[in-house]
Amino acid sequence: MNARDDTGEATQVRAEDAPPGRGTWRLDLAYEGTAYRGWARQPGHRTVEGLLGEALATILREPVRLSVAGRTDAGVHAWAQVASFVCARRDLRPDRVRLSLNALLPTDIAVTAVSPAAPGFVARRAVSRTYRYRLWLSPVKPVRDRAYVWNVRGAVDTGLLQRAAALLPGRRDFSALTPSAHLYHSYVREVLTAGWRPAAGDDGPPGHAEWAFTITAGSFLHNMVRVAVGTMVDVAQGRMTLEEFAEGMAAGERRRMGQTAPARGLALVAVAY
């Protein structure tokens, strides 16, 4: 099994730097993850990497190896994903490649930009990734946004959500927030920022109350954001205390944390280099 160093990113699976005579290219893309078994190519399953790789091979007439900033899990969305590849051609016409890719890809995947990159650029080497998780705190069903939010039933203390999020920033062992006990060389990560804020729009139905959790880190552990969100909701609904949250984090034990939030509420929203 490959070791990973962020959310689904395998350290032993990496695109090579471009050798002499080959071009390096960057792809910016967005996708709705509902219909996919995540980013990573998996035999027998529909994945974003699988479809994108097939489309690129058709256009370039050669197989390519993709690197990606955030290797999203099944059902997770990405509104600001970055991928890269190297190929024999250095004279690609970016707009034509973008149009051709979008013609071949399904409507829930969109390539927003194709651009030449400096030799040595590899998408997975991002400095930081930002994820956002959306909660719907209303008795009114989120019909329009049902594929992008977690509709939480029952009262939620948003003040406790905010206090729980304040425990996350910093550099420490986050092994309590992943079910993957033997997947990583190190479980130490640095969370740069984390916080909740109301995200209700003026066009919401009566009783509408949407809250969004935004977190930025250099890299993430598998399911780290979803376990954090699920546990914070448990705190906000009285199933565990802030002290138990902090103690579970310090102990590094997944069994002491709360539920795992559904994938549909999570999206990759920014990548920095």
Which ranges hold each PLM region?
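Structured-RNA-binding interfaces characteristic of tRNA pseudouridine synthases
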Residues: 2-273
